[in-house]
Amino acid sequence: MSSALSQASPTAPRFSVLSWPQVRRLDAILCESVPIHGRGNFPTLSCRPRDLVQVVRSRLEQKGILVHNVRLNGSAASYVLHHDSGLGYKDLDLIFMVDLKGPDAFQVVKHAVLNCLLDFLPSGVNKEKITPMTLKEAYVQKLVKVCTESDRWSLISLSNNSGKNMELKFVDSLRRQFEFSVDSFQIILDSMLMFSQCSENPMSQSFHPTVTGESMYGDFEEAMDHLRNRIIATRNPEEIRGGGLLKYCNLLVRGFRPKSEVDMKTMQRYMCSRYFIDFPDIREQQRKLKCYLQDHFVGMEDKRYDYLMTLHQVVNESTVCLMGHERRQTLALIASLAVHVLSEQNHPQAVPTFTCYYQPAPYIGEVNYNSYYFTPVQPLMSCSHSYQTWLPCCN
C-alpha cells in the first residue's frame, strides 16, 4: 500500500504553533459578526463566534459539564492555516471537548446552548415566555445526537440563510475525526479566548497568544504539504463514512488530486462501497445529493454540473458492491440531477447541438425523473477529467 494510505509514524509531530499571519486570520474569523436567522417572526441574532463560544462554555461549566478545550475544525481551520488552498470555507465548525458520561448530559448540553441564544436577542424582546423548544424551532438548522460504544457526541447547527452556519459540536469520544489530510486540522482556541478576556492591549506581531494547531491525520507538516499542493490523501480509507465520497469528488472539482493512481483506486472503491452502505435507498441518495449541492456550492453554482459529472464517473468506475440494477439506478439519479442543474444555469440556449435520450426504465418514475432529457455533445466547461461529456441512456 502506498505512503499516503500507510499508518502514521509514531514520532510524527501532530501539533504546530501558528504563525502571526495565521493568528490574524483566526482572529478575523472569531471576531466577524455572523447572523443567526430566525424562522417566522423571530428576529435575526447577530453574534461573533468568539462571544458565542465564551457564553456557551461558561453556561456548560455552570451546569457541571467539564469543557476540556474548544477547537475550530474543518474548512475554516484549513483556511486559517493556508488561505489560498482553493477550499475556502462556509460553515464554522466549533468543537467543544466535553464529558458526556452522565445520563442527562446530552439534554443538559442542548438546553444550555439554547438558553445561551437568549443573550443575543435584541433588547426589548420579552424573554420570559421563550422556552428552549421555541428557540430550537426558531434558530436550529440541525440537531444530531450519536451515542455508541466508540462515539459519544452531539451537534447543534444554527441557521444561516446564506449557508454560513455555526455548528457547535460537543464531543466526548469520536473514533474518526477527519476524512482527508487537508480537512484534518483543528485549532485549539483556548489561548485566543483567554487573551480576549484578559488583555487590555490589542494583538500585534510582537504581542499575541501562542495558538496551537493539530492534524488528526497524524503528521501536521505532511498534511500542510498536501493542503499547499492540493493533494488528496487519507489513512484507513475503509473507516470513512458515506459522505466521504461526496467530499472526495468536491476536492477533485476544486483541483485536488490523489497522490498516486494506487491511492485513487483504493480510496474510490472503499468510498463507493461505504456510500451505498450508508445510503442504500435511492430516495435517501436523492435527498443527500440535493442537500450536498445546496450546502456546499453557495456562490459556486456553476460548479455543480462539473461536480455531478465527476461523481458519475467515480461511481461508474469504482462501484463493485452493487447489483447492476442498483448501480444503473444511482447513475441515472446523478445524470438526472446533472441535467437539472444544467438547465438552471441556462446553458441550453448556448449549445449548438444536443442529443435527446429516452429513458423507459421502470424505476425512473420513483424519483421524479422527466421522460426526456438533453445532454450537450460538446463539453460546456473546461475540465481535466477524461470522462465523456455526455451521459448515455441508462436502461
Swiss-Prot record:
Keywords: Cytoplasm, Nucleus, Transferase. The keyword Nucleus applies. GO terms for molecular function: poly(A) RNA polymerase activity. Its EC number is 2.7.7.19. It comes from the Eukaryota. It is found in: Cytoplasm; Nucleus. It is an enzyme of class 2 (transferase). One of its GO terms (biological process) is negative regulation of cell cycle. It catalyses: RNA(n) + ATP = RNA(n)-3'-adenine ribonucleotide + diphosphate. One of its GO terms (cellular component) is cytoplasm. Its main location: cytoplasm. Catalyzes the transfer of one adenosine molecule from an ATP to an mRNA poly(A) tail bearing a 3'-OH terminal group in an ATP hydrolysis-dependent manner and participates in cytoplasmic polyadenylation. May be involved in maintaining the translation efficiency of at least some genes through preventing degradation of their mRNAs. Belongs to the TENT family. This is Terminal nucleotidyltransferase 5B. The gene is tent5b.
